[in-house]
């Protein structure tokens, strides 16, 4: 049984690529045709890649690998958090801070600081500080929650990075490759398939396409960890 059907992908708009002038020739193997100046992705090949990606991700989860979902653009942000939380993965959905992977010692210290501030807030310790100091601490807390809130459960570097929009997340790609962390990547027609281990050619701009693909990958992680193979992911946000 296919992990994702052609009709599901068509309905989600997963076949729409970028304008032909914005393409990466390395994606030609995944392109079906050009229509009205826009490349159309071959969804038969996407389905094949998605089946492979599902099995690869499921096996990685079954062997205890830890996952990091990355997608910071507006239309992906909410989906990234939703699906990462559903499968117990960490996530970055606001902004990739330089060194999130390659300077992990410093990043881990910032995450620990976030946890300390959250404990202080919940215990009332911040409220007991002078007004100005409390304001500064709360501002720091809000900023850390915004950018690092999805990493609180990440005690060490991830084993796999799941990526939305390779072009936008260039720094994440470079850091992962520098550390030999494999990438499971949604690839639009302007991307480079050579920069990831597990390619999924599809529209990485449409919300419903992102929902569908990340939802299935979250299903794969849950199946690998818990043995459940019910496809619940990729549902539309309310």
UniProtKB/Swiss-Prot annotation:
The keyword Ribonucleoprotein applies. The gene is rpsB. HAMAP family: Ribosomal_uS2_B. The keyword Ribonucleoprotein applies. It comes from Prochlorococcus marinus (strain MIT 9211). GO terms for biological process: translation. Belongs to the universal ribosomal protein uS2 family. It comes from the Bacteria. SUPFAM superfamilies: Ribosomal protein S2. GO terms for molecular function: structural constituent of ribosome. GO terms for cellular component: cytosolic small ribosomal subunit. It holds the Pfam family Ribosomal_S2. This is Small ribosomal subunit protein uS2. Keywords: Ribonucleoprotein, Ribosomal protein. The lineage of its organism: Bacteria, Bacillati, Cyanobacteriota, Cyanophyceae, Synechococcales.
